[in-house]
């Protein structure tokens, strides 16, 4: 059977060039066809066109000149849409958002709501970064007279959720848990991805983990000083450790597992826009990949959408005066679609 989809054709209001399939290797084409194409799409160029038209549409009005440029950029491998935009943009499946950052409250209702939110976010194609630093630590009294089991067993629930909920074959559920360096469970948290040592029911082998460092802690490491682990519920010191020993625990875990992520939360909040500070907002964690810092709280789940430029073609796209501006407009439009 002869493929009539060759050369330049009209598609979704713009011109696409099926010959640009050769810009992708076999593995790339096979992956796109297996996971990214929508309904009657048969070629990567059609997916690029769909995402381009979607990214060029603002409040129902499409800028087809922008769509044509976005298609040219993507089909020329100057940049690539994120997985949620390329797989979900312009379709009725999933969301175009790459990352969600949410907050875990210190209550049974809050934990239940967090689990429920994770189900919907993971099955819509987004990666999640959750902040656990305000959940009371192991052994602290609860309002019902019992003793808390701490945050780790509840993280283990999320660990199972990420295996169970995903967006079909396109994107598996993925989650990064963040905790403050002063939390009493920090030593156990550092090692939750290690298969050996400790209770298997308090391991999270399918999660990523990140730690919020502070200027005060880093100074304590430099000074080889003591470091207090403070329960977020009682605000009392539960344990005192050596800061440098804790630092080396993190370094050893990173050598063995590649994680935990480490971010300086003080530096992040120092850079928070003054308009958000005036609203009492605060950065509590980063996202799944430790690349985005946005304010979160119990009422505020942050979102971000992404795309990536290809430095292999820097000499080509760096000469284009509207390339970066077009990508920013595209991402703004994607956020507007989500809203």
Question: For each predicted feature, which ranges?
Answer:
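Extended catalytic cores of very large enzyme megasubunits
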Residues: 1-339
């Amino acid at each position: 059977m002869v493929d009539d989809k060759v050369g330049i054709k009209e598609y979704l209001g713009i011109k696409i060039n099926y010959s640009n399939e050769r810009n992708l290797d076999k593995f790339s084409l096979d992956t796109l066809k297996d996971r990214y194409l929508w309904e009657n799409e048969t070629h990567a160029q059609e997916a690029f066109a769909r995402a381009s038209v979607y990214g060029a549409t603002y409040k129902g009005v499409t800028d087809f000149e922008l769509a044509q440029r976005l298609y040219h950029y993507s089909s020329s491998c100057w940049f690539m849409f994120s997985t949620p935009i390329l797989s979900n943009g312009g379709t009725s499946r999933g969301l175009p958002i790459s990352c969600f950052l949410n907050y875990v409250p210190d209550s049974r209702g809050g934990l239940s709501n967090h689990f429920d939110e994770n189900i919907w976010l993971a099955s819509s194609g987004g990666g999640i970064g959750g902040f656990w630093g305000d959940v009371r630590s192991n052994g602290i009294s609860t309002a019902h007279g019992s003793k808390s089991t701490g945050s780790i067993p509840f993280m283990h629930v999320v660990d199972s959720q990420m295996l169970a909920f995903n967006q079909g074959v396109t994107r598996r559920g993925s989650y990064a848990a963040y905790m403050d360096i002063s939390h009493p469970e920090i030593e156990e948290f550092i090692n939750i991805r290690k298969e050996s040592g400790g209770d298997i029911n308090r391991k999270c082998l399918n999660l990523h983990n990140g730690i919020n460092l502070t200027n005060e802690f880093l100074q304590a490491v430099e000074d080889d000083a003591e470091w207090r682990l403070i329960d977020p519920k009682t605000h009392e010191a539960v344990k005192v450790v050596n800061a440098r020993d804790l630092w080396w625990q993190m370094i050893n875990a990173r050598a063995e597992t590649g994680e935990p992520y480490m971010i300086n939360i003080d530096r992040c909040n120092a850079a928070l826009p003054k308009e958000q500070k005036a609203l009492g907002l605060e950065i509590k964690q980063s996202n799944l990949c430790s690349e985005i810092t946005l304010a979160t709280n119990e009422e505020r789940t942050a979102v971000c959408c992404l795309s990536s430029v290809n430095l292999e073609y820097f000499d080509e796209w760096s000469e284009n005066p509207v390339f970066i501006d077009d990508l920013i407009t595209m991402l703004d439009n994607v956020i507007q679609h989500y809203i």
